[in-house]
């Protein structure tokens, strides 16, 4: 355990003190309002009741004054817990809600500063060619294809949640030495509204992703997940004496700016990267006998060893977890399965090993014999049932997959309705371009196409058949434009188009930096 502590302290040697005084500087809130450092983080501006953006600077100055006054500041935080729909408190809530959000955003900027400096220093010391390619979610599947086919066992690990607030404060304390800032964070997190269910399961606490706390939530969650990665890295280093140069290629994904850039939350309907609860954050390492991948709150650990070896990994991880975080880790969160008989649901794909056997007849002089060869291939399939469940939750079809209209879109123009449905279909096709059987997407396309027709018919008080006849060619062009035709405009013309026409070819893209909404909604 002392060795683990020394390993962690070595990585945290560059702590940043004296961040609390910056909380009283106006430019910190200007950074928060302007998407933070270099605009790399997702941010949604605040709407204050009865005020425009021009008056926000005056409100920020008033906020700084109230922070100096302890009693006044306490009332600001407590007022944010009041019901925003109470009419006689309408204006007071406008102030309180704005103050609470600005404090949250300003604090997020402050705690991000040490990690942004660390990331810049990391890239200055170590240049990684084409590191931008590693940012794609799809980049992890070629890694899995090359590794899982030679491994025997796989463990699914769920990172524990919810997390007690004091654990998050202790994690920040490891990186930040500024005691006043830590006390401020503890006070704010315990007083602010909705934090009693912080880091609950994403399907039970979608309201946590409010405009007021989204940025700070993502930062704290990533700091927590980063500590989990420390434990896996420590076990990896102690389980093998082989030093892998490829490990560094993936390590930069741990840094917060790279993570949080992918952690955008486009809709409350879903994201997340997991339980991220946030989007497409990937991390992995490989050894001669083990490989591990993490996305959001799910970790996949595969090994070529025995079932006993996987159990040792499991109990070592559980013991280190309980020692480091000081709370119980339920062992049932880790499932060990034989890879040959297991389908792994990961990043919107059902992945399993497909055994291919081939027989070769070998003739040597007068003797002939048969050679049987068995190879394992990673098969990635589209989970149609899960996608239909997502479409059902989003009210595009029934639970059984029967298309229905989308009433809330009926007020849009015909062009916008068709464009929205078509964009969903194209995004799904793009995200699942790595599927071994792309025909499975045809049913999803059919549901979206017929749902679009029903929505248009509902808007114009007509029949579905009428709109299918009238807009048949337009709908076909929107929903059934094959991805190969798009690729033909991108790839060199010298390659015959028949190459793109094959439905058996899996294509992994390097521009997908977040999990598809419908995939994560299931």
Swiss-Prot record:
GO terms for cellular component: chloroplast. The keyword RNA-binding applies. It comes from the Eukaryota. The gene is matK. Keywords: Chloroplast, mRNA processing, Plastid, RNA-binding, tRNA processing. GO terms for biological process: mRNA processing; RNA splicing; tRNA processing. Pfam families: Intron_maturas2 (PF01348), MatK_N (PF01824). This is Maturase K.
């Amino acid at each position: 355990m002392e060795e683990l502590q020394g390993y962690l302290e070595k990585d945290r040697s560059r702590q940043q003190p004296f961040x609390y005084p910056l909380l009283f500087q106006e430019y910190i809130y200007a950074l928060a309002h302007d998407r933070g450092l270099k605009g790399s983080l997702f941010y949604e501006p605040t709407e204050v009741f009865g005020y425009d953006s021009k008056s926000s600077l005056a409100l920020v100055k008033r906020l700084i004054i109230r922070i100096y006054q302890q009693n006044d500041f306490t009332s600001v935080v407590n007022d944010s817990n009041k019901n925003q729909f109470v009419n006689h408190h309408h204006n007071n809530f406008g102030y309180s809600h704005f103050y609470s959000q600005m404090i949250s955003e300003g604090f997020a900027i402050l705690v991000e500063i040490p990690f942004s400096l660390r990331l810049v220093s990391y890239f200055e010391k170590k240049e990684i060619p084409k590191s931008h390619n590693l940012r794609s979610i799809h980049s992890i599947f070629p890694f899995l294809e090359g590794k899982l086919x030679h491994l025997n066992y796989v463990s699914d690990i769920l990172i524990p949640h919810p997390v007690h607030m004091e654990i998050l404060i202790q994690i920040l304390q490891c990186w930040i030495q500024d005691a006043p800032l830590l006390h401020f964070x503890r006070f704010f997190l315990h007083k602010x509204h909705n934090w009693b269910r912080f880091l609950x399961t994403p399907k039970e606490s979608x309201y946590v992703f409010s405009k007021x706390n989204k940025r700070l939530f993502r930062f704290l969650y990533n700091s927590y997940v980063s500590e989990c990665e420390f434990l896996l890295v420590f076990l990896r280093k102690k389980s093998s004496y082989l030093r892998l140069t490829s490990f560094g290629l993936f390590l930069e994904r741990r840094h917060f700016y790279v993570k949080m850039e992918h952690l955008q939350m486009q809709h409350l309907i879903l994201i997340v990267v997991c339980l991220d609860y946030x989007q497409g954050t990937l991390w992995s390492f490989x050894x001669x006998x083990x490989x591990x991948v993490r996305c959001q709150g799910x970790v996949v650990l595969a090994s070529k060893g025995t079932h006993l070896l996987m159990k040792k990994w499991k109990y070592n991880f559980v013991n280190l977890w309980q020692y480091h975080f000081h709370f119980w880790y339920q062992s049932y969160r880790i499932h060990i399965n034989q890879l040959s008989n297991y389908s792994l649901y990961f990043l919107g794909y059902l992945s399993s090993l497909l055994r291919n056997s081939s027989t070769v007849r070998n003739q040597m002089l007068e003797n002939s014999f048969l050679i049987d060869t068995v190879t394992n291939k990673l098969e990635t399939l589209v989970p149609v049932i899960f996608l239909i469940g997502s479409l059902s939750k989003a009210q595009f079809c029934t639970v059984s997959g029967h298309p229905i209209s989308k009433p809330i879109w009926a007020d849009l123009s015909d062009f916008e309705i068709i464009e929205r449905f078509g964009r969903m279909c194209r995004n799904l096709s793009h995200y699942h371009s790595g599927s071994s059987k792309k025909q499975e997407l045809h049913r999803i396309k059919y549901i979206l196409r017929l749902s679009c027709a029903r929505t248009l018919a509902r808007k114009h008080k007509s029949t579905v058949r009428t709109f299918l006849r009238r807009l048949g060619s337009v709908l076909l062009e929107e929903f059934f434009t094959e991805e190969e035709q798009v690729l033909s405009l991108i790839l060199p013309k010298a390659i015959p188009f028949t190459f793109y026409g094959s439905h058996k070819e899996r294509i992994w893209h390097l521009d997908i930096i977040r999990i598809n909404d419908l995939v994560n909604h299931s």
